[in-house]
Design a protein with these regions (language model features):
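Eukaryote-biased recognition of intrinsically disordered, low-complexity regulatory segments
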Residues: 2-15
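Short, contiguous acidic and Ser/Thr-rich linear segments
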Residues: 15-23
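Short, structural beta-strand-to-alpha-helix junction motif
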Residues: 24-28, 52, 72, 279, ...
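A basic, amphipathic helix-loop patch mediating RNA/tRNA/ribosome contacts
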Residues: 22-53
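Cysteine-centered iron-sulfur cluster-binding motifs in ferredoxin-type domains/subunits
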Residues: 20, 40-49, 104-114, 158-168
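C-terminal structural segment of proteins
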Residues: 11, 54-58, 65-68, 95-105, ...
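S4-like RNA-binding module at protein N-termini
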Residues: 55-84
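NAD(P)H dinucleotide-binding glycine-rich loop of Rossmann-like/cofactor-binding domains
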Residues: 78, 82-103
């Protein structure tokens, strides 16, 4: 038996749903099997955006665009979901729908619902941020405001990849929307039910019922004590690919998404404590003031749909050699706090936590509690090179952290992703930099040393030689920026 003992309940287009299904059933599967076929399946991996829906995960935030193809329906208990069928209010089209009609932005039509939902989510965020008295009014017109609106429009649909018959009308629709006031969706649609959200389905049956969503650390540890080998899920942006791409099954899943201690986030002027279930989106918003290098970089991680779901702990736990956060956390000498159901918390340096290709120190019964980082006031540069600007996997990534006394380096941390079986640092290179002044001769020597030290593979994303050259060039670029030298602007590095 893999069904939960009592159905979960969630709001779908204003109607309360009660559903009992597999632990790993996706929202997209649920929608299409129940006849709501406006939400399309394109890639089944969270890349194309055709399956975009809006989800209100708590009553303190707007509806957020998410990929239904990799979203477990069991995680929606108490939440509110809107699909393209439910977007109109009182039979009046939502402005995003109307704008695409007016500009002839439907392309072939298959991916249009995803574009509509992404734009509607962006509009809702603007209206929600304005508050009840703001009326969702757009920013006053000016050339600078127009530039910002256009950039925001492009960002809103960066997770919708279809370009089949003409992209410009879609951009025109988006820019039209940027100048229109709108009302927050919670004013016209069903909003999250707080009491239902805080409730739990009845789990009086044995644990084999499949899906659990503990709400405290103690409850999480109790579940792990019963089933230490159960699969843990937070955002599921990587784990659910085992289901959608490899036809795997997860009969037992424990969700970390509702444990407040794992969603905790503190960033001060020089340090950060990041709960493992903190989403990329929440981290990006919090990092803007004290960790601008990370704030800038995170706009290159996935898409809005992915950033609304993916988590810091998930990026760490999968230990992918191209995991976007791993070089950054290596360069920051991050400490990983691991918990266990029957042992005290354990602090582990990230350099020891990563054990090889998709291997970590995590053992059955373990989970990542939080990540601790210091050095936010140091000189920081994070780079990612990929074939697409948005929503793409890195071919190579570089993270550089320097402590400087004038132009002399007193501490250096240099980390790379996409160049080996795991993200790595070059300690010998770092040691050689300490006490050195940044000179042209030093940068030339470092460039050569990186070429010698790295031995990446060639694959569909990049050749071995390209990866080596790019890694070396980006390190030199960081050192030149540390000197304050003017650098040419590079699309994807400087305009995120």
């Amino acid at each position: 038996m893999t069904d939960i003992s009592n159905p979960i309940q969630f709001w779908l287009n204003g109607a309360l749903q009660a559903h009992s299904g597999r632990a790993d059933e996706t929202l997209l599967g649920y929608l299409r099997h129940s006849g709501r076929v406006g939400t399309k399946e394109g890639c089944a991996s969270g890349d194309c955006g055709a399956c975009t829906v809006l989800v209100q995960t708590d009553d303190e935030h707007a509806y957020k665009p998410m990929n239904a193809c990799i979203l477990p329906v069991q995680q929606l208990h108490g939440q509110a979901v809107i699909t393209v069928e439910g977007l109109p209010s009182n039979d009046v089209l939502h402005p995003a729908q109307a704008a695409l009609i007016e500009t002839h932005g439907a392309q072939c039509g298959f991916c249009t619902p995803g574009f509509v939902m992404a734009l509607a989510g962006w509009m809702d965020e603007q209206a929600f941020s304005a508050g009840p008295d703001g009326g969702g009014q757009p920013e006053a017109d000016s050339p600078q405001a127009e530039t910002r609106r256009l950039k925001a429009c492009r960002e809103a649909i960066s997770g919708n990849l279809c370009r089949c018959t003409g992209y410009r009308p879609i951009l025109q629709a988006a820019t039209h929307l940027a100048s229109r006031p709108t009302r927050a969706l919670f004013e016209t649609h069903q909003r999250l039910d707080k009491a239902l959200f805080n409730s739990q389905p009845d789990h009086s049956a044995p644990y084999k019922t499949g899906f659990r969503a503990p709400q405290t650390l103690n409850d999480l540890k109790d579940l792990l004590r019963q089933q230490p080998s159960a699969n843990l899920i937070a955002g599921g942006t990587d784990l659910m690919l085992e289901v959608t791409q490899k036809q795997g099954r997860f009969d037992q899943l424990i969700s970390l998404a509702r444990v407040p201690a794992l969603r905790s986030l503190q960033i001060s002027s020089d340090s950060a404590i990041i709960g493992s279930a903190v989403t990329y989106q929440d981290l990006q918003a919090a990092a803007e003031l004290h960790w601008p290098a990370l704030h800038h970089f995170l706009s290159r991680l996935g898409s809005p749909q992915i950033r609304n779901r993916g988590t810091v702990g998930g990026n760490l736990g999968t230990a992918s050699p191209i995991g976007d956060l791993l070089p950054i956390l290596l360069a920051m000498d991050a400490t990983i706090v691991m918990s266990h159901f029957e042992a005290a918390d354990q602090n582990v340096a990230i350099s020891e936590f990563l054990q090889g290709y998709r291997k970590t120190q995590l053992q059955p019964g373990n989970f990542i509690k939080e990540v601790q980082v210091t050095g936010l006031q140091d000189f920081l540069r994070y780079y990612k090179i990929s074939k697409r600007q948005e929503d793409d996997i890195a071919a190579v990534s570089v993270a550089v952290r320097l402590k400087l006394d004038a132009d002399q380096i007193t501490l250096a941390r240099i980390a790379f992703g996409g160049v080996a079986e795991q993200a790595l640092r070059l300690p010998a290179l770092e040691q050689a930099l300490q006490g050195q002044a940044i000179t042209e001769a030093l940068m030339t020597a470092l460039h050569q040393q990186v070429l010698i030290a790295l031995n990446p593979i060639s694959d569909v994303r990049a050749s071995r030689d390209y990866r080596r050259e790019m890694a070396a060039n980006l390190l030199v670029r960081a050192l030149k920026e540390a000197l304050g030298l003017p650098m040419p602007q590079i699309y994807g590095l400087d305009d995120a």
